[in-house]
């Protein structure tokens, strides 16, 4: 516990906020190349095959990112855009791939929440 005089002389140091998506380096999104596309299983109470990809970003960092939506066309060497946002039941997955940009096509036959999955307006 500091004394009043110590606080007057030095003052308190502000706590720094830790980034939840450090690989983006303060950018809203980053481009990268898929190095591996695979499925993985979620943590304990859940059961599924979640689609994920290892992505090497333009700044050289390699991250694991989630492929949202039903079905995808991604394979090795696909160029993708990633954004922050973790997947709660997949440990180590802190990024999402943005659907409908670069090599990633939008979700087919999507009627609701289309903007999140890069789907065009149905005719």
UniProtKB/Swiss-Prot annotation:
What PROSITE patterns does this protein map onto? RIBOSOMAL_S12 (PS00055)
- Give the InterPro entries listed for this entry: NA-bd_OB-fold, Ribosomal_uS12, Ribosomal_uS12_bac
Q: Name one GO molecular function term.
A: structural constituent of ribosome
The keyword Ribonucleoprotein belongs to this UniProt entry's keyword annotation:
yes
* Entries under Pfam families matching the protein: Ribosom_S12_S23
Q: Where is the composition biased (Basic residues)?
A: 109-123
Tell me which GO cellular component terms the UniProt record holds. Answer: small ribosomal subunit
Keyword Electron transport carried by entry: no
User: What processes in GO biological process is this protein linked to?
Assistant: translation
UniProt keyword terms in alphabetical order: Methylation, Ribonucleoprotein, Ribosomal protein, RNA-binding, rRNA-binding, tRNA-binding
Role noted for this protein: With S4 and S5 plays an important role in translational accuracy. Interacts with and stabilizes bases of the 16S rRNA that are involved in tRNA selection in the A site and with the mRNA backbone. Located at the interface of the 30S and 50S subunits, it traverses the body of the 30S subunit contacting proteins on the other side and probably holding the rRNA structure together. The combined cluster of proteins S8, S12 and S17 appears to hold together the shoulder and platform of the 30S subunit.
What family does this chain come from, according to its entry? Belongs to the universal ribosomal protein uS12 family.
Q: What is this protein called?
A: Small ribosomal subunit protein uS12
């Amino acid at each position: 516990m500091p004394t009043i005089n110590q606080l007057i002389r030095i003052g308190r140091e502000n706590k720094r906020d830790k980034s939840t998506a450090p690989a983006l380096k303060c950018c809203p999104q980053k481009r990268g190349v898929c190095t591996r596309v695979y499925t993985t299983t979620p943590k304990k109470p859940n059961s599924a095959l979640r689609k994920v990809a290892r992505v090497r970003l333009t700044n050289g960092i390699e991250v694991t990112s989630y492929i949202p939506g039903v079905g995808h066309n991604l394979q090795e060497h696909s160029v993708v855009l990633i954004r922050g946002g973790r997947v709660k039941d997949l440990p180590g997955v802190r990024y999402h791939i943005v659907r409908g940009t670069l090599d990633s096509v939008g979700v087919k036959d999507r009627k609701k929440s289309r903007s999140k999955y890069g789907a065009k307006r149905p005719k």
